[in-house]
Amino acid sequence: MIGENLRFALGDFWAEFRKNRAGMVGLALVILFLAAVILEPRIIPFPKAGATWHDITAWDDNPPSAPPQWINRFTEKKAAITSVVTQYEKTSEQSDSSTLVTYTFSYQDPYDVPPLDLIVHFVAAGDVPFAVSVVRPDREEVPLYQEQRQAGTREDVRVSMDRNSASALFDYLKGYESEDTLSSVDPGQLKPVQILFSVAEPGMLKHPRPLKGMYQVKLQGLLLSDASALDNPYVVFTGRVSGLLGTDNSKRDLWSGLVAGVKWALLIGVLTSFIAVAVGVVYGIVEAYFGGLVNAILQRIWEVMVNMPLLPILIVLSAVFKPSIWFLIVIMSAFFWVGPVKTVYSMALQIKEETYIEATRALGAGHGRIIFRHMVPILVPYSFASMALSVPAAVVYEATVSLLGLGDASIVTWGQILHDAFSGGAVLNGLWWWVVPPGLMIAVMGMTFSFVGFAMDTILHPKLRTR
């Protein structure tokens, strides 16, 4: 019987809820946020972004402060997009005492602005002399780097051509530029990758023209013994634009950071509002049920708490103690519970005068049974609406604390991204893709639960429908 009544009640609620356009928009956004949490590893290019966000070395292959790649649609000159090439052709040449392995990667360059860097990754073991060269579209092969690698065990090797091939490209320029031009150039200040992707002609140093077409990157390694190895190679072409939302000045992918922050925003908002509303509902019922001295004492406590400024207290406590997401949730819950108390109190005053409450008391039911079995269930629908309306405040408070640099540094939140943006000079340098998206996400998250909360409030309180 109870299950059937619940089913009909939920059916009636849904029939009313789906008529509310704002509520349906909010519900759709909630589903979208939940889908982002569930599908996070599949929809971001860096699935471990949450764990490595504060590990700057994990983002070395990205360009710093790069705009989103879709910006190319609105510019005359198309900038190179960051690309990872994992497909290769492998050849081996065996001799009596060694083996020469060659990995060839193909990269089509249709861009007007060349990549920032060309980075070669592989795993090496033992004594492995290796060399990197590039065959340009004009069929000229340019040697870039070589090294005698000695590794006792297998280790990851990363070679950046922007950092390691300046001397090789300076030698390459000698075939095209005059001695007077070269004498005025410091080899250490060259931009090797820009030269590599330019038409080979006199004047290419000062006025480079893009050389478009197919480039082939060759990685050659000489395996001197059975213990030597060179495998798992791939090449990264670090572009001038990167990802759906660009990168920050630490080369971190902002799309990955925003998606990784969704789960923390939901956790902060939902858990804080759940704890606060649960405490507030019980507090208001107890205050109304007992009345008298209990009511007077609880009323004084409520008046003290409701007049205490939460944000300054949060800032001071976060500065004194080690910032933690759980610490913030507890502190916010300790202040948010005052929100629903007065409404619950007024409703509970009416409920406790109902005939069935008097009958339950006459049958010998205890105070706890009356409160939790007969009064709390009646106020549960209101509790859900109050919870939804409390979520935006929790999200904004956390973002404010993080914006001041006092958030939990072990996770990724939108407030932290905004803090990094302001401390990194994003506004002054016009890096709008670093500031606007996290701000919009905070606003949309707040709007989402406000829509749902107001829709539920309107349905569960019929007098509000005329508002």
Annotated model-derived regions:
Residues 247-467:
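Alpha-helical transmembrane segments of integral membrane proteins
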Residues 1-269, 421-439, 443-444, 451, ...:
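Gly/Trp-centered helix-boundary motif
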